[in-house]
């Protein structure tokens, strides 16, 4: 016979698995549609018209039209495509289901059009809203927070292809003063995360790891080097943190999402022309291309890091629907490769992983997620002790500093007033 605690854990296991599978399937369908549209916009259409896909006019034109299209969706769709991601954390309160169609369309347009944001925030919003709405009908005794936790865990598992990230994140958020053991509370979220990760793995494998030279043995000087690299990445990230709310306020003075996002798309197009096609889109596939291109120099990596960080700030400030984690990882990789090219004595494994740790820590202010992203992009167990040590001064630097998020005004924002 099972203990009552075990029966309590099993009670939510079936809904957890269902939510994990559904979270993954929603992500897969959205990404597939965006991929088809991206291929049409950036491969087939310019080929048919006899225009090079890296033509400045094409890049600026597509991104400007993408901004206008997303602005029209936000302007006229019910619920105005959900909340502005610049004002929201990764895991937020559930939104009304009526806002989801507009949010899905805005997300797909942004992903396909080359906007420098990832899918993580909108997908999280969609899955949480659906889980809460459906779960409240089927099992009204279960509170909204439980559905929110299960949906966010399933989405994290689906996004990263492993339940490890969910385990790390929720080990701190669920660790309250309750007498219920932590792993009892983690059971259902981990079931959801595992189901989401396994479902994603059936269709495609998220490819985060980079082909970077193996790091052999940790030395004391490597800790100092890693801390300096993380500090440089944090400094770059804090510039973006300072710029985001100011640019957001300036852009939203126009009070018209079509105009705001059209201008935002135009600026992104100019940045894309300067940085080239590798600086477009969410950044995961592009960072693989960046590492594979042996022709890039120190100045090229620096330019890509600056352009991508600027594009991230512009896209977020303009109100595009997307997340900031994936493009931040690209910035970390570019910074790390630049620092390795500048000081070849410091292994690329250290510069890249510590730069990712620093920049993701600025964006998320989540130590576990930052460690996870650094470890999966540069998968080397020898680096784990070094990353844990480097995390300590990095966390000290960011203690009490503002987050990369805009404080929502007391009144409704312009996009929701329209």
Curated annotation (Swiss-Prot):
One GO molecular-function entry: chloride transmembrane transporter activity
One Gene Ontology cellular component annotation held by this UniProt entry: plasma membrane
Transmembrane helix among keywords: yes
Topology versus the membrane: Multi-pass membrane protein
Sequence intervals crossing the membrane: 10-30, 54-74, 99-119, 120-140, 149-169, 186-206, 223-243, 258-278, 300-320, 322-342, 343-363, 371-391
InterPro entries linked to this entry: Chloride_channel_YfeO (IPR022969), Cl-channel_core (IPR014743), ClC (IPR001807), ClC-type_chloride_channel (IPR050368)
Pfam families, per the entry: Voltage_CLC (PF00654)
Keywords: Cell membrane, Ion channel, Ion transport, Membrane, Transmembrane, Transmembrane helix, Transport
Subcellular location: Cell membrane
Database matches in CDD domains: Voltage_gated_ClC
Principal subcellular localisation of the protein: membrane
Superkingdom in the source lineage: Bacteria
Similarity comment: family membership: Belongs to the chloride channel (TC 2.A.49) family.
HAMAP family: CLC_YfeO
Protein's name in the database: Putative ion-transport protein YfeO
Source organism (scientific name): Shigella boydii serotype 4 (strain Sb227)
Lineage: Bacteria, Pseudomonadati, Pseudomonadota, Gammaproteobacteria, Enterobacterales
This protein's encoding gene: yfeO
């Amino acid at each position: 016979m099972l203990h009552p605690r075990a029966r309590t854990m099993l009670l939510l296991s079936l809904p957890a698995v269902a939510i994990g599978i559904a979270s993954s399937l929603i992500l897969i369908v959205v990404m597939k549609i965006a991929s088809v549209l991206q291929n049409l916009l950036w491969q087939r259409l310019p080929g048919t018209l006899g225009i090079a896909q890296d033509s400045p006019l094409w890049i600026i034109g597509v991104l400007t039209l993408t901004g206008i299209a997303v602005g029209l969706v936000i302007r006229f769709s019910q619920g105005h495509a959900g909340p502005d991601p610049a004002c929201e954390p990764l895991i937020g309160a559930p939104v009304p289901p009526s806002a989801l169609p507009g949010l899905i369309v805005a997300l797909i347009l942004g992903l396909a059009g080359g906007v420098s944001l990832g899918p993580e925030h909108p997908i999280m919003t969609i899955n949480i809203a659906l889980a809460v709405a459906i779960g409240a009908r089927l099992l009204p005794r279960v509170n909204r927070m439980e559905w929110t936790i299960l949906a966010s865990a399933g989405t994290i598992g689906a996004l990263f292809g492993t339940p490890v990230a969910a385990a790390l994140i929720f080990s701190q958020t669920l660790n309250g003063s309750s007498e219920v053991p932590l792993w009892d509370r983690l059971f259902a979220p981990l079931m959801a995360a595992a189901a989401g990760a396994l479902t994603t793995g059936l269709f495609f494998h998220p490819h985060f790891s980079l082909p970077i030279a193996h790091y052999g043995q940790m030395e004391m000087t490597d800790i100092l080097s890693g801390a300096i690299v993380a500090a440089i990445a944090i400094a770059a990230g804090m510039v973006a943190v300072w710029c985001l709310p100011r640019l957001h306020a300036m852009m939203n003075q126009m009070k018209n999402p079509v105009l705001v996002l059209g201008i935002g798309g135009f600026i992104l197009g100019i940045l894309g022309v300067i940085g080239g096609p590798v600086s477009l889109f969410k950044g995961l596939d592009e960072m693989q291309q960046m590492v594979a291109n042996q022709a890039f120099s120190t100045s090229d990596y620096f330019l890509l890091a600056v352009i991508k960080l600027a594009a991230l700030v512009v896209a977020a400030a303009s109100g595009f629907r997307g997340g900031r984690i994936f493009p931040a990882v690209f910035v970390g990789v570019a910074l790390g490769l630049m620092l390795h090219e500048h000081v070849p004595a410091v292994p690329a494994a250290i510069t890249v992983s510590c730069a990712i740790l620093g920049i993701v820590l600025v964006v998320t202010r989540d130590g576990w997620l930052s460690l996870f992203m650094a470890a999966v992009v540069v998968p080397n167990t020898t680096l784990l002790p070094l990353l844990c040590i480097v995390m300590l001064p990095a966390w000290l630097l960011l203690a009490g500093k503002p987050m990369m998020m805009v404080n929502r005004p007391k009144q409704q924002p312009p996009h929701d007033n329209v």
